[in-house]
């Protein structure tokens, strides 16, 4: 590893140190991430030719473009759902059953787990955070709820072919079928969620809150709400056309926006038509900037070969079909995904390991890469998005309350996989 690679690692570590302690230093994590990512690419570019940089930069910007537009579309749809009182409707109807805070905690966790498997972990997290805002008044309860949402979303996404980027990569690479990841991955993934869920439940405090009355959700609103949720389904279906999910998001968002403008200007909700135009302005751009900075930094490490070195160190130079080495490697990679982007690490492993490896080992990689990111809040797209959406949930707060439960869930998931397939 040359001096420039070492310098990149140092900048990356220092950047994350300041991100972790943003409240202590008073500097927003989004600006730190942007500065870190841009600085690392300047170091990478020093001494390189434009021809050599063209393809890596093009690939990095394509990844960032996809995520930014997906996030902008998803956040707009979520804002629209809130605008039409969907989350308030959920609150009122749940409160009618006089469900305790802890029972509600389990119900929402279960919904998040399976919603993530159907949609994806990022979308599910954004939607559930908005629902939780209406259901938990106390900051402590809401933070615990968001922590559990991140863990449940990542666990649910790990057992679905479309729930997480890494499972999509492994599925499209032919490492397992859609049914195999669901059937053989669901039990370890459930364990990765249930153990932290059980631990975090004890931290939920009692809240004496009754559901507030709200406006009835009119038929027109229900139609738009259903159309909004359908947009997330379209984002999954466009994969059949070999298109990235953001195509489905912007397609569905365009249709919903057109219908809103047409129907609201002719119906009873005419007075609210102007508010719809402003929904995009309500998007938390700081969260998106944070994503951009983190992705730039990780792509710089990838271009410099740092991630390949890490993957090679984990598995060795010449990996053969050695179960012990593969299990150890996949488990270690999952732990590293708490700090580094699991996508390039997974991509390196796919290319590195020989063909013919039994699919159950790839199931393990899907589970570890998907759930290992829950150990730190910066380890997954769901965590980073939640960190941007919930200012009170800092890196330190998550580390103090969520990291150990998530780690125990991770260990439990790996142990469950081992008991299922190795004994």
Question: Residue locations for each model-derived region?
Answer:
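C-terminal transmembrane helix pair
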Residues: 182-189, 325-423
């Amino acid at each position: 590893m040359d001096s420039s690679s070492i310098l990149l690692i140092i900048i990356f570590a220092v950047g994350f140190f300041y991100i972790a302690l943003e409240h202590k230093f008073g500097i927003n994590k989004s600006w730190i991430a942007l500065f870190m990512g841009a600085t690392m690419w300047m170091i990478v570019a020093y001494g390189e030719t434009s021809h050599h940089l063209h393809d890596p930069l093009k690939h990095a910007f394509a990844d960032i473009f996809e995520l930014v537009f997906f996030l902008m579309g998803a956040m707009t749809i979520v804002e629209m759902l809130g605008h039409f009182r969907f989350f308030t409707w959920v609150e009122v109807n749940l409160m009618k059953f006089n469900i305790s805070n802890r029972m509600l905690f389990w119900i929402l966790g279960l919904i998040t787990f399976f919603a993530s498997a159907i949609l994806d972990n990022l979308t599910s997290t954004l939607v559930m955070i908005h629902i939780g805002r209406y259901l938990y008044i106390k900051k402590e309860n809401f933070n615990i709820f968001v922590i559990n949402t991140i863990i449940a979303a990542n666990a649910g996404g790990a057992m679905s072919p479309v729930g997480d980027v890494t499972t999509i990569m492994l599925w499209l690479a032919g490492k397992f079928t859609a049914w195999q990841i669901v059937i053989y991955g669901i039990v370890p993934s459930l364990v990765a969620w249930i153990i932290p869920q059980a631990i975090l439940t004890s931290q939920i405090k009692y809240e004496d809150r009754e559901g507030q009355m709200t406006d009835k959700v009119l038929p027109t609103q229900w139609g738009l709400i259903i159309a909004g949720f359908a947009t997330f389904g379209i984002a999954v279906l466009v994969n059949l056309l070999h298109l990235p999910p953001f195509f489905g998001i912007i397609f569905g968002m365009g249709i919903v926006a057109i219908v809103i403008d047409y129907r609201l200007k002719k119906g009873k909700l005419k007075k609210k038509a102007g508010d719809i135009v402003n929904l995009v302005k309500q998007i938390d751009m700081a969260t998106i900037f944070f994503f951009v900075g983190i992705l730039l930094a990780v792509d710089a490490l990838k271009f410099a070969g740092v991630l390949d070195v890490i993957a090679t160190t984990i598995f060795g130079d010449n990996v053969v079909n050695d179960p012990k080495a593969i299990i150890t490697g996949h488990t270690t990679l999952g732990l590293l995904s708490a700090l580094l982007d699991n996508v390039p690490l997974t991509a390196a492993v796919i290319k590195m390991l020989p063909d013919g490896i039994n699919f159950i080992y790839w199931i393990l990689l899907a589970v570890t890469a998907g759930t290992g990111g829950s150990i730190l809040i910066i380890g997954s797209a769901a965590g980073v998005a939640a960190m941007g959406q919930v200012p009170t949930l800092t890196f330190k707060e998550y580390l103090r309350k969520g990291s150990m439960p998530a780690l125990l869930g991770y260990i439990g998931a790996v142990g469950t996989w081992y008991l299922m397939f190795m004994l």
